[in-house]
Amino acid sequence: TAISAIDIAIWDLMGKLAGKPVFKLLGGRTKEKIPCYYSKLYAGPIDSMQAEAEEAMKKGYVGFKTRFGYGPRDGMAGMRENLKRVEAVREVIGWERDLMLEAYMGWNLDYTKRMIPKLEKFEPRWLEEPVIADDLRGYAELNRGPIPISGGEHEYSLLGCAQLLQEKAVSVLQYDTNRVGGITAAQKINAVAEAHQIPVIPHAGQMHNYHLTMANMNCPISEYFPVFDVEVGNELFYYIFEGDPDADDDGFLQLDDNLPGLGITITDKHLEHFEIEE
């Protein structure tokens, strides 16, 4: 939202004026460095997904998130295809790393209730956004089951996130700082989530989320999107700003104690990747 963008920019400016990184303005460092989970593994050919997972395993990520490619309209055959891919990824990453699963609101309540018993044996850390974001009762019902449910990236306010927590609709809260009102609103949500003993793992990577994670004990890890190609959405900001830390060395991110603000600047060096039509 527009107010989110303005709020994030103001925090960046305050940090630059104070000569301090934003995470210090938010309370300071709560962890030596930030553990990250690998967020890619889009549904595709099984051998390609396993090859991607094998390469990512070399980097030291604490977890791996994969996406489902099949939903209710695909019937039992689609269920089997979903399960094949989850099994293939779990086979590569083993049982010492977390496995996260995302449906991105592509399922309905009935389909999800049929899938969960089949997924339970893979011991996922969470099942993300299985149904449409507004189905609060559905989320609460699913969250009473054996697999923790995560969500919140499509909430646009403190109130919306508070309702998720009050209704015990999620076991992991994943607000999007770009939507809920920026860093100011995110900090309020963090406090409410901590009071409910629900961990917060902000949606997507992005520097403002890393600062929030660094400054909050209740934010244990960060989502990390490795940059392969231009992807309009979660990765586009990597081509507009420079200065984001790289987690590809050991699966952890570090923030500079001496870099003021968010620590990023606008760049035009990737313009050749974009085709501009007038």
Residue ranges and their predicted role:
Residues 1, 17-29:
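Short, flexible active-site-proximal loops enriched in glycine and acidic residues
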